[in-house]
A protein has these predicted regions:
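Short, ordered loop/turn segments at secondary-structure junctions
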Residues: 44-45, 53-55, 101-103, 112, ...
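Conserved mixed alpha/beta catalytic, RNA-binding, or beta-rich assembly cores of soluble enzyme
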Residues: 36-73, 79-81, 99
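N-terminal, positively charged regions that mediate nucleic acid binding
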Residues: 1-36, 41, 45, 193-195
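Intrinsically disordered, compositionally biased charged tails
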Residues: 1-13, 152-195
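Positively charged, low-complexity, intrinsically disordered RNA-binding extensions
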Residues: 108-165
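Glycine/charge-rich, flexible interdomain linkers and switch-proximal surface loops
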Residues: 75-99, 157-165
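Amphipathic alpha-helical transducer elements in NTP-driven molecular machines
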Residues: 17-20, 58-63, 106, 110, ...
């Protein structure tokens, strides 16, 4: 496809506008009205970022917020379509609880947590938003929670998941081992022969 100034190239990130707020500043001539835009972007492969920008027009504000979000990306460890372990985070009066969920649960979360989880690529998650309903503080709390994973605990969670997926059989050769019933029978035969 030929690229010119009218065709839009496809970005690697999906972007979602979380909030548009009309804000004003009082100046000498009256009120100066602008828009504050909160945007979250993600590639659904573990990378996600957010940006907050102000502009007199919504379109320019969204562009500013997207460019800020691209500068502040974080990478989230995803194990079996969920997070490695439960995490709780506070930011201001916002408190966020994120719990890993088994396959098939889907995203049990509301508001900004659902949007961020979808953009990260998490498919199974249980979440609870406690405290404020302020979207900016909730986004910051979720990002703080997602970037707070300890690499050592993540590795432990990966190893546990691999053990669950591929349980190694303790029995290498089934002919060598006997069931409990067979062992009891053979013990009885030996004791009968001795008598």
């Amino acid at each position: 496809m030929k690229v010119n100034k009218f065709t839009k190239e496809k970005s690697e990130f999906e972007e979602r506008v979380v909030e548009i707020a009309r804000v004003s500043r009082v100046v000498k001539g009256g009120r100066r009205i602008r828009f504050r835009i909160l945007v979250v972007i993600g590639d659904q492969k573990g990378r996600v970022g957010y940006g907050i920008a102000k502009a007199t027009e919504i379109a320019t504000g969204v562009k500013k917020a997207v460019s800020l979000a691209k500068k502040h990306l974080i990478t989230v460890p995803i194990i079996a379509d969920t997070i490695p372990y439960q995490v709780t985070q506070e930011f201001g009066s916002a408190r966020i609880l994120l719990k890993p969920a088994p396959i098939g649960t889907s995203i049990v979360a509301g508001g900004v947590v659902r949007i961020i989880a979808e953009l990260v690529g998490i498919k199974n998650l249980v979440s609870k938003v406690l405290g404020t309903a302020n979207k900016i503080n909730n986004v910051k709390a979720v990002f703080a929670a997602l970037s707070s994973f300890d690499p050592e605990r993540v590795e432990q969670a990966k190893k546990q998941m691999e053990k669950l997926k591929n349980p190694k059989s303790e029995v290498q050769n089934p002919k060598q081992t006997k069931s409990k019933k067979d062992q009891i029978k053979s013990n009885k035969k030996v004791s009968n022969l001795e008598n």
